């Protein structure tokens, strides 16, 4: 016998996977977007607060060291967001699929726990080969916190995916906010106590326990965490592997760019600290909320599976409009904001900030087309697009240009490769 969404079961029980809203509603409805949008705004503010406190507490040289760890953690957790994407797609797609009632089941949260443990072992075990090149200070503490923090984040990302797939947007937003607030609390304590670089490294990973707090305090979150999806664990892992590869490539551009910059530069120094801060400030207004709404976007594109290219138009127009305003604002008031907010040592030109904002728009568009590819189960095209964009950006960083110029060229032109790959694949599915 074949069944639809009811085939998703909780451990030891049978339940609908869609919460109170139902499968068909809520992905980009005003209520869910407002809740996730509010959570994204709070998350962005908290992220800015951590960056601000670190920049004020550390000189540009010290901030470049912190920025590399911040980027390294963003890189590995960005890759782990592939678990969020695949879990969202698996759970959400069940409303449109027929599955065998007596087939095998997968418990995504348990699988992600195994993935997290494996990631911890790989990072810690391989660290003697690369950590000396990446972490200039607090090397072994950085390795330990990177490994443990990633293990926790694998569970965090999967739980977000289960909440998104079941329309539990209030809990989805609460989990995001809990992560961000924990980080800023530790950063504020570091600023007051004077813990310097070590404290900000701790602050970076502190939010990785947020998933556990949500499970302890939220019954709807516990209900989502118990869900099982049809199919073998190997099937889930194959889909997740493509998403993780692509998400890892995207994370290099979105969060891990300071690491890529470090690996392609002899010495970052104070100039590198200014460039890293400029990249962070210009992209956060677009990419933080867009990343936070990955669950909404994937669910939306699954629902609009018959016209995926057309479904891209409205969000792409919104991103373009916000980006145009952002470019103007960055060019006019950006240098002044950097001097006033972070100190006279952080000097940046209007042109650099405006072009970096344009580069953020390119990455945002790539993120959007990538979400559509995931929703269409185009895992190979999704990963190929992001890997192509990352390789392109990495090669452009090797150009014999100034640090500022090659940063802009790499971040602006590299994503165009991936956008093209995604659009071609999506167009073929609509034929």
From Swiss-Prot:
It is found in: Cell membrane. Keywords: Cell membrane, Membrane, Transmembrane, Transmembrane helix. InterPro entries: Poly_Biosynth_Transport (IPR050833). It is a multi-pass membrane protein. It comes from the Bacteria. GO terms for cellular component: extracellular region; plasma membrane. The chain crosses the membrane at residues 33-53, 63-83, 111-131, 143-163, 175-195, 197-217, 241-261, 273-293, 318-338, 358-378, 381-401, 407-427. To M.tuberculosis Rv1510 and M.bovis Mb3654. PANTHER family: O-ANTIGEN TRANSPORTER-RELATED (PTHR30250:SF11), PST FAMILY PREDICTED COLANIC ACID TRANSPORTER (PTHR30250). This is Uncharacterized protein Rv3630.
């Amino acid at each position: 016998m074949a069944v639809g969404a009811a085939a998703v079961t909780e451990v030891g029980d049978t339940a609908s996977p869609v919460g109170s809203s139902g499968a068909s509603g809520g992905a980009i409805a005003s209520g869910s977007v407002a809740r996730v949008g509010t959570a994204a705004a709070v998350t962005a503010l908290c992220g800015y607060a951590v960056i601000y406190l670190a920049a004020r507490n550390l000189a540009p040289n010290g901030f470049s060291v912190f920025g590399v760890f911040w980027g390294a953690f963003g890189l590995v957790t960005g890759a782990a967001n592939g678990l969020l994407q695949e879990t969202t797609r698996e759970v959400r797609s069940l409303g449109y699929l027929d599955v065998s009632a007596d087939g095998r089941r997968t418990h995504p949260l348990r699988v992600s726990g195994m993935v997290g443990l494996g990631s911890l072992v790989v990072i810690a075990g391989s660290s003697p080969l690369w950590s000396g090149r990446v972490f200039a200070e607090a090397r072994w503490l950085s390795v330990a916190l990177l490994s443990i923090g990633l293990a926790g984040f694998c569970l965090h990302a999967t739980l977000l995916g289960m909440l998104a797939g079941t329309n539990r947007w209030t809990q989805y937003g609460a989990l995001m906010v809990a992560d961000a607030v924990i980080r800023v609390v530790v950063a504020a304590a570091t600023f007051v106590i004077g813990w310097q670089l070590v404290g900000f490294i701790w602050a970076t990973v502190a939010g990785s326990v947020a998933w556990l707090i949500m499970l302890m305090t939220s019954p709807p979150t516990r209900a989502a965490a118990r869900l099982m999806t049809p199919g073998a664990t190997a099937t889930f892992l194959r889909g997740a592997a493509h998403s993780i590869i692509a998400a890892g490539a995207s994370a290099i551009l979105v969060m891990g760019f300071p690491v890529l910059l470090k690996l392609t530069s002899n010495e970052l120094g104070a100039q590198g600290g200014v460039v890293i801060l400029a990249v962070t400030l210009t992209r956060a207004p677009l990419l933080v909320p867009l990343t936070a709404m990955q669950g909404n976007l994937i669910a939306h594109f699954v629902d609009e599976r018959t016209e995926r290219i057309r479904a891209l138009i409205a969000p792409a127009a919104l991103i373009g409009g916000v980006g145009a305003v952002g470019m103007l604002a960055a060019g006019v008031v950006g240098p002044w904001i950097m001097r006033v907010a972070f100190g006279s040592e952080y000097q940046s030109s209007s042109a650099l900030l405006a072009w970096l904002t344009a580069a953020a728009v390119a990455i945002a568009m790539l993120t959007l087309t990538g979400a559509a590819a995931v929703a269409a189960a185009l895992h190979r095209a999704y990963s190929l697009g992001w890997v192509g964009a990352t390789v392109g950006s990495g090669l452009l960083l090797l150009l014999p240009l100034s640090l500022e110029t090659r940063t802009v060229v790499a971040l602006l032109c590299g994503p165009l490769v991936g956008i093209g790959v995604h659009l071609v694949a999506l167009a073929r599915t609509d034929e």
